[in-house]
Amino acid sequence: NLSNPLLSLIKTPAFQGGPVLGNSSQNDQDLVSLYLNLPEVRQLLPSANRYIKILWGKEDENGLTGLYAIKTNRQDAPPLSGGVVVDASQSFDATNNPAVSMQMNSQGAKVWEVLTERAYRQQSNIAIVLDDVVYSAPGVSRGAISGGRSEITGDFDLNEAIDLANVLRAGKLPASADIIQSEVVGPSLGQE
């Protein structure tokens, strides 16, 4: 597509309204990111979305990677770092699907309650990011989550749930996971 070369590099996700804006092959990621970060493209964003960071997810079984637009702040600092996660483990939800249980310290629990309330009200998502890769971007299904204990459910298999628990536990390591509010809608995050 010569009139819009970006559209030839991005495939529309099968599920509209989710956190993934589009999918692209890993070979095209740098070019897509370059296009999306051009000043003339960034200028087109409404002022409320001025601080947007373009991030990619993990490659799927078809060799495609999800594109996310993550809302940040002027300092590009995440509202929560993985250091607030005191425990995370793979579990199973009420319907016996793989899930991740997570517990935060008291400081993290307070911020988490505010983030989850906002995500619930705005029907947006919360991205879990490690080394600028989005590992999960669940939505909030039942309102603010207080107390810092949460269960992350979604369309992932057992190995993906184990990986996500490991990413959340990585907060104790130098390369900690960041938890960032995103402005899109998708899979679900509920109170355990």
Can you say where each PLM-predicted feature lies in the sequence?
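A mature extracytoplasmic/lumenal domain signature
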Residues: 104-106, 156, 181
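Juxtamembrane "pre-transmembrane" interface segments
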Residues: 159-192
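Generic alpha-helical secondary structure
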Residues: 109-112, 157, 161
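A generic structural motif
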Residues: 100, 148-156
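Residue-level signal for pocket-adjacent positions within structured domains
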Residues: 135, 147, 184
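Non-transmembrane, solvent-exposed regions of membrane trafficking/translocation machinery
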Residues: 1-140
